[in-house]
Amino acid sequence: MESLGLHTVTLSDGTTAYVQQAVKGEKLLEGQVIQLEDGTTAYIHQVTVQKEALSFEDGQPVQLEDGSMAYIHRTPREGYDPSTLEAVQLEDGSTAYIHHPVAVPSESTILAVQTEVGLEDLAAEDDEGFSADAVVALEQYASKVLHDSQIPRNGKGQQVGDRAFRCGYKGCGRLYTTAHHLKVHERAHTGDRPYRCDFPSCGKAFATGYGLKSHVRTHTGEKPYKCPEELCSKAFKTSGDLQKHVRTHTGERPFQCPFEGCGRSFTTSNIRKVHVRTHTGERPYTCPEPHCGRGFTSATNYKNHVRIHTGEKPYVCTVPGCGKRFTEYSSLYKHHVVHTHCKPYTCSTCGKTYRQTSTLAMHKRSAHGELEATEESEQALYEQQQLEAASAAEESPPPKRPRIAYLSEVKEERDDIPAQVAMVTEEDGAPQVALITQDGAQQVSLSPEDLQALGSAISMVTQHGSTTLTIPSPDADLATSGTHTVTMVSADGTQTQPVTIITSGAVVAEDSSVASLRHQQVALLATANGTHIAVQLEEQQTLEEAINVATAAMQQGAVTLETTVSESGC
């Protein structure tokens, strides 16, 4: 048993609190009168509180401060890479070994298991005097120790009190191995963020020193955690990000959907959380822009959407001579493959390699029928379900709508095609339809043969999903080379701004109306040889991801899209 030296403090209102033995050699005597910082008079009484030393089972998982998991062992395990082990001293004086699932630098790992845990972790950082907040915190701690010692065993026979520190906030009750990590966790309830970035014009604040350290790397560009895969050169700011990335190589999907009958699993808890909202219908993030009000299932999609209104593109390619800007980090991350020939992602079924995980996922869906989820695909599938439910609720039968099918997968990644351009190809590999890039830098291009083969209108859906662009039937003479203006048509039939379609051989001036494409962020919906292709761009996702979403929806059942035909077509 470990003795914790405490003094009871009887406040002037008759209540009792606890303070730790004074620091800096100062003695507190029985019956001594002290004055707290708020002017309250208190009286000192000596007490001793017994606290059980923490016990750990061999192989018990522990949570690191960056949120990743490790495992604790009494002795080193045979077959473990020495670089994945780290020796720590437990509170009882014994030595244990922390095993990380992936190798990380030991000097940058902050463990949830610490060598010494004292009440100073809960006191104010200023050692001089006692603040009212410190007395309250110490009172809570003393009652917590006494309470945890009386916690009964649960149904599995595991003593919950072994982890010692339980969150007292209503509806939470999470347990932690150290007082320090309980304190860090409680900041999620209080909103306290004591660690502030001192970079000019930043000022962001964080609940932990590790969070601040990871954030500073966004300013410095430091990425100390490198992927151990031989053909992969990626590096990351945190060990948690590296751990998530490694799962793209191993195929590990540890986070399962809790809904009965679903059975899907995911590489990260955040993707699972977004997926669960497709079951519940929750959309907690709402756009504050007047007349918009769109809701989103994830904070990432919400922030990316807001940048549509602000025009902000904060992510810049640092490769000399490039300088392209993007509204979201994932687009910049995927853009980097344009500057490298590395293809680190391998299909576990056929062995084909790809530069991007999204391209690999599209290949798996098309070639092998395997479904993988991303935040964006879950968002789009949810919206598709909502549209289908709304159509089913209509009393009158819906108008005839063309069926949608996917022509073919992207057969090959070509080095001369920018990463953000998705191409639909024929079986012989010849390009059939080229799609606009996410940043709008490349125009929509259709060959005369494609236009002649159109059996119905082509529709383009705006970012808001409320308007469609309709090209009239082939008798409108769109098969000729040049530029043709068509009109954006809203759901109620109101004509909005014109958009220019570029056919083969046309040269477009920088100040032409094709510039509107750069702001509309549209995806191409086309028909060819009687078969419809449908790709809708949602929430600033890339066209490649949009194709993934459409393919997944088609494989789950018949998917249709209602097209709006313009009366005049121009």
From Swiss-Prot:
Question: What molecular function terms (GO) are annotated for this protein?
Answer: DNA-binding transcription activator activity, RNA polymerase II-specific; DNA-binding transcription factor activity, RNA polymerase II-specific; RNA polymerase II cis-regulatory region sequence-specific DNA binding; sequence-specific DNA binding; sequence-specific double-stranded DNA binding; zinc ion binding
Give the UniProt tissue specificity note: Testis.
Tell me where it resides.
Nucleus
Q: Where is this region: Disordered?
A: 365-401
Gene Ontology cellular-component terms for this entry are: nucleus
| UniProt-listed InterPro entries | Znf_C2H2_sf, Znf_C2H2_type
sequence repeats sit at 34-45, 62-73, 88-99
Residue segments, region 3 X 12 AA approximate repeats: 34-99
Name any one Pfam family assigned in the record. zf-C2H2
Supply one GO BP term. regulation of transcription by RNA polymerase III
> Position(s) of the covalent cross-link Glycyl lysine isopeptide (Lys-Gly) (interchain with G-Cter in SUMO2)?
K24
Q: What does this protein do?
A: May be involved in transcriptional regulation.
For this chain, the family text in UniProt reads: Belongs to the krueppel C2H2-type zinc-finger protein family.
**What name is this protein filed under?**
Zinc finger protein 76
Q: Which organism is it from?
A: Homo sapiens (Human)
